Amino acid sequence: MPKLGMQSIRRRQLIDATLEAINEVGMHDATIAQIARRAGVSTGIISHYFRDKNGLLEATMRDITSQLRDAVLNRLHALPQGSAEQRLQAIVGGNFDETQVSSAAMKAWLAFWASSMHQPMLYRLQQVSSRRLLSNLVSEFRRELPRHQAQEAGYGLAALIDGLWLRAALSGKPLDKPLAHSLTRHFITQHLPTD
C-alpha cells in the first residue's frame, strides 16, 4: 500500500530531476532513465505518474508556469493599493524571480518554447503564459492610459521582459537584474503620464 502523501513527493522529485537533466544535457537528450536515476526511482515510477516523457515535460512546464504565476501574484498582493507603476514593477519582478532566471529554469523555458511549436499541449501552456503576462501588463497600464495606448505599452513591456530574459538565457550568464529593472522602469515611466 502506498504511503500517504507519497504522490506529491514523488512528483516533486521527478520534476526537480527533469529540470536538472534539462540543465545538464538538454530536453532532447534527457532520457527517462537519466531522470529516474537522478530522482532515485525506477523508470516505471515515471510511467505511473506521468505516462511518458512528454507527460513529465508537460508537468515540469506546468510547475514552472505555476511558480511564475505565484511570483507575480505574491508581489501584486503585497501592493493592493499600489500605483500602476509599482504594480507594473511587481509584474516585472515576478518575471525576473529566481525561480524563472536560474540556469535550469531558463534552459527549461527555452526548450519549452521550442517544443511548443510542435506539441499542442505545450503550445497551449505557452499561449496561456504569454496571454497572462500581456493581460496583467495591459490591465495595469489601463489604470492610467486609454485602451489602445495601454495595449501598445503592455505589448512593448512584454517584449522587453521577454527580450531581456532571452538575451540572458542565450548568453549563458545570469540575468543582470539591476540592469533589467532599470530598463523596464525606464520603459514604464516613459509610457505612464507624469503627474
Curated annotation (Swiss-Prot):
Every HTH tetR-type domain range: 8-68
Gene Ontology annotations of biological process type: glycine betaine biosynthetic process from choline; negative regulation of DNA-templated transcription
Keyword tags: DNA-binding, Repressor, Transcription, Transcription regulation
Keyword Cell membrane tagged: no
Entry GO MF terms: DNA-binding transcription factor activity; transcription cis-regulatory region binding
Feature: DNA-binding region: 31-50
Function: Repressor involved in the biosynthesis of the osmoprotectant glycine betaine. It represses transcription of the choline transporter BetT and the genes of BetAB involved in the synthesis of glycine betaine.
Protein name listed in UniProt: HTH-type transcriptional regulator BetI
